[in-house]
Amino acid sequence: MSKYCCNIDHKRVVALGGGARTLVISAFFIPLFFLSSSEAYSEDGIKSNDRIYNRGGDIGDVTGIFNSNTSAEGGAAIYNTGKIGNITADFINNEAQARGGAIANGSAGVIGNITGDFIGNISSADGGAISNEGAISAIINSNFINNTVKNVDEYEFLQDDVYGGAIYTKKDLNIIADNGVSIFSGNKVDDDGVIVQNAIYADRGGIFSKEPVITLEAKNYGQIIFDDQIDGNAKGYQLHLKGDKTSEISFNNSIKNAHITLEETNVNVRDGVYISDNKSLDVKSGILNIANMNSTAINYEKFTVNGSININSVDVDLANNSMGHFSADEYGESNGNIDVKGVNLISDSHDSATKVLFADSSYADTVTYSGASHAYSTIYKYNVGYNPDDGFFTFVRSSGSMNPSDNFNPSVLTTPVSAQSGAYSTQMQTFNYAFQHADNFMSLPIFERIALKESGRYAMTGSAGIYSPLLTRIENAGYWVKPYVSFENIPLRNGPKVNTIAYGSLIGFDSSIKPVKYGFDRVLTGYIGYNGASQNYSGVDTYQNGGLLGGTVTLYRGNFFNAITLSAGASLGESHTMYGKDNFTMLLAGIGNKLGYNFEFKDGKYIIQPSMLMSYTFVNTFDYTNSAGVHIDSDPLHAIQLTPGVKFIMNTKNGWQPYVGINMVWNILNKNKVTANNVRLPEMSIKPYVQYGLGVQKRIKDKFLAFGQAMVSNGGRNGVSLSFGIRWFIGK
């Protein structure tokens, strides 16, 4: 900073600007004078990095910026054994080779209020920013950032250990946030390379000295935030947390060796372990909010609650019958409230029902449980309850539901759910749509099919009034494409109700019709496909994307047809659970056979076509470990499906071919063994269901055939499946 104006007297010191000198104020000398390595007092005033050395003197307020001062003694910016008024200043990058990187207040020192920011100060003894052995009225709306106390080898004669990354005190200390913010962050103790994030260390002056009292007061919407620990002498010290209901004091690091008292204000503790290593806890009033308590007890010499403690989550170790809780050698009279808002199960019980102690009988009736009625371990689901009469939580694994999947964490059910409602359902869609040539060709009357095979044209029938479109090339080879999508919910047997969307597209090529032995005609079809699916159940979202290859052989003889298809593919799955993202791979294959017969009426204007589809599906989900660390081991799924059905087809004069279809679907042998950490999961399957719907196809000129279908499912699958497509013919 450039030149400034200042006043210097016994009542006030204003220090602004830049320089490198020492102002010495002594009760034993009459004059005031400056000392530095090369100059005495001059009239140009005090500059911003001038050092104040008050040896028993009495001065007023200090205002300024103390930047980059160094001192071989304590207090690189201010050393005080006398009296100083209020200090309003920032202390930046000052370094002392003894106590107090910025300020050293000796045992006889008295300082008023301190307001300012302490950033990057360093000391080689106690107190990276402030060392206090005297009296400081209060530190108000001040931030302590990245201050360090460091035990340097060349200064080991000073002391063996160093304390107080930001502040070291042997006397009472008041830290206040009054409609402002005080942050302690990045402060540390570096003791021969052992680094501890520490903000304040409270020490005792001697054998007969009393416990120092550290008071943190937040008021008028003030906030005090500690990212670094508060520690003190093992004999203990007092830590008073006070303020009003508009303000907060937050701890993101530990408090150690303190007798903690809370009054009126709101105190936030990120983890219960941060307040576990202390002498006592007395919540007189106000609210103590604890984000999480681990599964071990917090033991105090004395524990009293007359305010409120809110615990967002408590870890429960069912395998060892323990959970986080407060215990003490002595319990004070408690009339407050401890509210547990949730539990986190970190292990599973050996039994279906487990009781775990949470509260001593002296305060058990002050505890309430306001969390969910159930909780999940990584594998199981438990019903949760609390008994205020004895202080025990109960965890019951049996949910009372007739559905065994209700006893499990949904995150471990991804494999059986995806195998059934994802991969298996996708394979069923393939079987439904792979018989494209038979679906198109067998919608024609027999005389037209014969005409196609023999002459490549339909014969005109004169005035008979029989449907006879011209110049169709369905007997020729052709390409086809058939996209599809379905929107369904699937109430799996022994499993959850799954909302699923399946989508994909098949692209195929049909050969021309060729005669073979025994009066049959044959068509060969090859196809490739993309398939995708998504499932949602019990808060779990799962997605699969994959592809397949397949081939179909279709045989025709008169009004009879038989088609057999074989396909294989793979799919990559991604599941999002309460623990994160899981990835898995699925291999699927299958064979299906569809046969049917046409019963024609009125020269083929109306056709009734009963059919039977039989299929076998193989789905293998490769073993994987999910994001909760549970190993999922799956045996392959082997499934057989039987689908009898009937179609009612109408051939119109203008070339439209509408139809109505109905199918009954049975799934048999469609269960697979899946384990989670060797725990057998429910074997799920799709219940029988009925499909019904309508479709239409239309020949367009001489080159194309367009078709579409909508089918509704009820029973084991509920929803709608939509498909449409086009076939175009090649050749003359």
Region roles according to the model:
Residues S505-S511, L549-L555, L566-A568, I591-F599, ...:
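Residues on the lipid-exposed face of transmembrane beta-strands in outer-membrane beta-barrel proteins
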